[in-house]
Amino acid sequence: LIYIIFFFNSNLLSEENKILKVGLLAPLSGPYSKLGNSLVHSLQLALEEIGNKEIFIIPRDSGFNNKNKLDIAIQDIKSQGVKVIIGPITHEEFNLVKEYNDLIFISPSNINPKFTNNIISVGVSLESQLLVLTEFIKKQKKNKTVIMFPKNKYSKLIEEKLSNLDLKNSKIFKYSSNPEVLTGEIEILTNYSQRKKSLELRKKMFEDKEDEQSTKELERLEQLYTLGNVNFDSVIIIDFGNNLKSVLASLVYTDVDQNKVLFTTINQWFDKSIFYENTIKNLYYPSINYKAFKKYNDNYYEKYKVYPNEITILSYDALGLIYYAWKKNGKIDSINDFAFKNKIKGKIGTFSFKDRKVLQELDIYKTDNNKFIKF
């Protein structure tokens, strides 16, 4: 394997102003070392694609939510004459890195997608996803949207994001992450009990009648599970993994008509299990460009014989963003050097930097015949 060259002494480099040194904060040891190594490998791929030998990566082990390790790693990177650092990978570590106001941090976190002090978050933000989803729902001529998300530590953050977006024709529905409780909550949302009763009452109207029309109507009703529509025509489910599968299963169980209700969720990084292991025929979600994502994964696998963690493509793009700023300005002095007026195209899609906010132009995807199709 070919690894990034580690430079431990900046004095070894001549013509310092012609060299771009980028730090990397990654968990290179401990339970998340696999992620850390994946980040290092992704930057190696980015370096090879850029093809400029004047760029050097200085990775350091920052642990995972380990303040002491993070602090030591930053100080070590800073001592090498580095101005811009890729990381930290979690939003919880932002408070510490803010103290290093003479450094610039490009984080793959998607929690706060904007310029915050000396940090730029370039993750696939909830704002970007919701903007794309609501526009998609509008184009499908749906106007009664339920935005669903679990009651957990992120609930308040999601509510704040939704409030800032001021989405119209929508209502919020928070649910339990416990599958046993969840089904009952969705029964209430979908008015399931009343729709079941309505069906039984309707069937009784025809049970004692023997005319052909009544017999046919009864046969039709026998094929149904409920009678009547739900009071929404679209859903946005802000959840992942097995929790998302449970929500989808509960919506199917409560007989939500998939021909009348549009099912959408947020970015799932093309997780095949989400789309192939649920009973929803058409599930839509916004994401980065699938072809670029697949090409990145295939190139990574060809080189390292394992597939990368999804977050690494964000770091891959972060290096490209740093390189662009460096080439455009001839140097990087402050976070303002990244306040581009024009849109920037990367692997994950197209970035725009408006009012110091970072937004991505995402595509809508669905599954069709076991394939991801751009809608």
Outline where the language-model segments fall.
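Extracytosolic ligand-binding ectodomains
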Residues: 2-6, 12-375
